[in-house]
């Protein structure tokens, strides 16, 4: 397992504050959201996996934002379809 350095990951994100936000969002996705890792897990914890993904350029703030927007739109569409089917059945 290659060691992840903060400096390498900060260079990919821009600053250490955004790094904390992006890496924690991604780690939470990996741990609770049922998202698959984009790098081999190698028995690492979600936080380390998130940092490795950032270091390799696989995860960015814009990518996370786009994925969350897409998931929200899909959820909204499913809810709208469910409500429509209920109102049409009356």
UniProtKB/Swiss-Prot annotation:
Listed under catalytic activity are: RNA(n) + a ribonucleoside 5'-triphosphate = RNA(n+1) + diphosphate
Q: Name one Pfam family in it.
A: RNA_pol_Rpb6
According to the UniProt entry, its GO molecular function terms are: DNA binding; DNA-directed RNA polymerase activity
Q: Does the keyword Transferase apply?
A: yes
Protein keywords: DNA-directed RNA polymerase, Nucleotidyltransferase, Transcription, Transferase
Q: Which domain of life is it from?
A: Bacteria
GO terms for CC?
A: DNA-directed RNA polymerase complex
Q: Which SMART domains match?
A: RNA_pol_Rpb6
Which SUPFAM superfamilies does this entry report, sorted A to Z? Answer: RPB6/omega subunit-like
Its quaternary organisation is: The RNAP catalytic core consists of 2 alpha, 1 beta, 1 beta' and 1 omega subunit. When a sigma factor is associated with the core the holoenzyme is formed, which can initiate transcription.
- What is known about what this protein does? Promotes RNA polymerase assembly. Latches the N- and C-terminal regions of the beta' subunit thereby facilitating its interaction with the beta and alpha subunits.
What is the similarity comment for this entry?
Answer: Belongs to the RNA polymerase subunit omega family.
Protein's recorded name: DNA-directed RNA polymerase subunit omega
Name the species this protein comes from.
Aliivibrio salmonicida (strain LFI1238)
């Amino acid at each position: 397992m290659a060691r992840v350095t903060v400096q390498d990951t900060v260079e990919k994100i821009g600053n250490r504050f955004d790094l904390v936000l992006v890496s924690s969002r991604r780690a939470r996705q990996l741990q609770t959201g049922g998202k698959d890792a984009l790098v081999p897990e190698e028995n690492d914890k979600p936080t380390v996996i998130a940092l490795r993904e950032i270091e390799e350029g696989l995860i960015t703030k814009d990518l996370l934002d786009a994925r969350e927007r897409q998931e929200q739109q899909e959820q909204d569409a499913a809810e709208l379809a469910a409500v429509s089917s209920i109102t049409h059945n009356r």
